[in-house]
Amino acid sequence: MWTWLRGSGDNEMRVTIHQPQFLPWLGYLDKIDRADLFIVLETVQFKKNEWQNRNRIRTSEGWQWLTVPVLHRFGQRIHEVQINPTAAWREQHLRALEMHYARAPFRDRYLPDLRALYERPWANLSELNLAVIRWLLQAYGITTPIRCAGEFPAREEPTDRLIDLCRTVGATRYLAGPGADHYMDKPRFEASGVALEIQSFQHPTYRQVYDPFEPNLSAIDLLLCMGPEALSRLRDNRPTTLDAVGASR
């Protein structure tokens, strides 16, 4: 039995589990910040045209994608997906970030470290995403520990997998995203003895490099605009309670 209590009272432990996203948005970081342990779900199928190899940044015309080109086969798991070595994605991303965030107040504080991360010899998408997530959490000041699902035994069916991961690490609560209805058998999960909570995320507003405000961008946007105040801005807009489903423990 693994125990990862991080200041939760009464021996409660909240775990959240999610696929590794590239330059994830604020809702992703909010969910990690609320948890005592974050498990990266890199063992499930890669989904093309979602958020595992792309995200959005602010531009003068609205927003644009930053996409990591990949080589993958249908049914391939995220941790098996390789980055296309012939594409110049690093240069394109860095050029876009430096151009569109040239007037961001904290550009010089964070972009050099992000550039150094980009310039490492990446071949595997999951490894890149995990490094980017770790960098973002450190830059924000989010201290939630991270483990990978591949470290633990778990069944393949989606709800069974979540139950197994929660039980293995000793979780008493599982924090799911708002889309839990689409992938979870809630009654069966609640019967496992782990309390189910649903994230309620309210997107913060803040001064961006361009007007009007554009929500749902990569978390790099808030970081470059507000710097050390980014985490408090994220937390200030947070509902005081989570939505609990059921009363099982």
Regions found by a protein language model. Name each.
Residues W2-R249:
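Residues lining hydrophobic/aromatic ligand-binding pockets adjacent to catalytic sites
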